[in-house]
Amino acid sequence: MANNVLNRYLFEDLSVRGELVQLDEAYQRIISSKEYPAALQKLLGELLVSTTLLTATLKFEGSITIQLQGDGPVSLAVINGDHDQKIRGVARWEGDIADDASLHDMMGKGYLVITIEPKKGERYQGVVGLEGETLADVIEGYFANSEQLKTRLWIRTGEHEGKAHAAGMMIQVIPDGTGTPEDFEHLEQLTATVKNEELFTLPANELLYRLYNQDSVRLYEPQPVAFHCGCSRERSGAAIITVERAEINDILAEEGSVSLHCDYCGTSYSFDEAEITELYAKAAPEKKTLH
């Protein structure tokens, strides 16, 4: 069984590249941080797969964020991933959401934002409306309009052996001019036959052979995908001391402690009065040095 891994592959004779991502634990970590409705869990899985597939196209160190915003019950759904395939995500919603709610049922009138942030270089952001029935439709439209590259995605979420899985495939034309529309259509037809169980369970080499055994496919080394939110007690403490001490004292007087909650993983960090005093005391010499 293939778990939490991204595979890149190339159709050497057809000028088309492909990607395959298969996730279970990384997906489960994201949807277990809050009591997300079933339809929103599915949407987060689709966003997660899409982001992972897109980060695989990065030719530099950096990150990609895919964000949905709308005026529906779900106001925000966002996944962030980087070149090392460290991913995290969160969503915000209000009210009840039906188990079979569609993208448009959840988001209402909204848009998709794709943000690319290189460690070195300029930040890029693309915004598109929610055209199409599914998230895959929206992202395919983004590539057609902004990148002008023929791209297809197949994204699946579901359960296997009682555990949540999210997986997907992407094929994209390589802009070298040697491929034909017929080549791409041929691969589209083959990829569209993939079954959920195959995506959730088969190792990449076996899955690609089942789909493309008549074509020449080069499979590259796999890359692990892992949930990573980046929160810590140290970072929480550093955030607290950016607030005026008087304001923190008011919270202490009312609550008895100061707590920070990580939306990504669901962890809370609590600091009592003695710990707060120590934080500010340690920070004081640093502030004097800065002045």
UniProtKB/Swiss-Prot annotation:
Q: How is it modified after translation?
A: Under oxidizing conditions two disulfide bonds are formed involving the reactive cysteines. Under reducing conditions zinc is bound to the reactive cysteines and the protein is inactive.
Q: Which NCBIfam families match?
A: PRK00114.1 (NF001033)
Q: Where does it primarily localize?
A: cytoplasm
Please state what the protein is called.
33 kDa chaperonin
Its source organism is Vibrio campbellii (strain ATCC BAA-1116)
GO terms for biological process, alphabetical:
protein refolding
Q: Which GO terms describe its molecular function?
A: protein folding chaperone; unfolded protein binding
Q: Which family does it belong to?
A: Belongs to the HSP33 family.
